[in-house]
Amino acid sequence: MAKDNDNETRTALDEINESLTGLEQKVQNSQRTIMWVILAIGVVVCAILIWIYAIRRPGMAAADNAVGQADITLSTGNDSTALEQYRQVADNYGYSAGNRAALNAAILLYKDGKYEEAAKYLDKYDATESVIGAAAKSLQGDCYVNLDKLGEALGCYDKAIKISDENPLYTPYFMMKKATVLREQKNYSAEAAVYREIIKDYPMYGAQNGIEMEKYLKRAELQAEAGK
């Protein structure tokens, strides 16, 4: 009987030992997995740090220096040289400096009457502030008007209106541009609708800018009625 008990005890101990051995093996395997995960994370972190300190920061510094030089050139009145400098920054760099360079290049190109190229640089510009972003989109619309691409112009003015976020100074200004294009397209009913919206939402705009909004509206309504 004692021998049976001894055998049972040994069997139980063996089972425990086997369980412990299996558990130890699982722990070792888990430790290896964790080690490889940590190593992989370390490699990724190192790559990110290298990108930030060896590539991104020097790139940002170079872009800032280049656009700063273009700003100095522009301040001396040498627009053509400044334009080339802005174009180089916009074409070769990202970051905020490249973004601003794209906008400045577009403005100078527009002044030179190079509307198609100006519109392309405005496509590169990523607005970070509502008023400037809306003005940039409006300028792109002006480019398309000069290229007789009225549909594209309307799209730009609609975006400018949305981006300007009901700014009482700028939103109705962009709406007036939209109405002008609609008039050019002889879409008088849509033109009238824009004037009504300005009068309703920005009642002081006309008086503040010397624009007789009611007369503009009446004219559009009469022409819309005549065209039916």
Locations of the language-model features?
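N-terminal positive-inside, membrane-proximal cytosolic segments immediately preceding the first
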Residues: 2-40
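Short solvent-exposed coil/turn linkers within tandem alpha-helical repeat scaffolds
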Residues: 57, 89-98, 124-134, 161-171, ...
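TPR-repeat structural position
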Residues: 79-80, 115, 150, 188
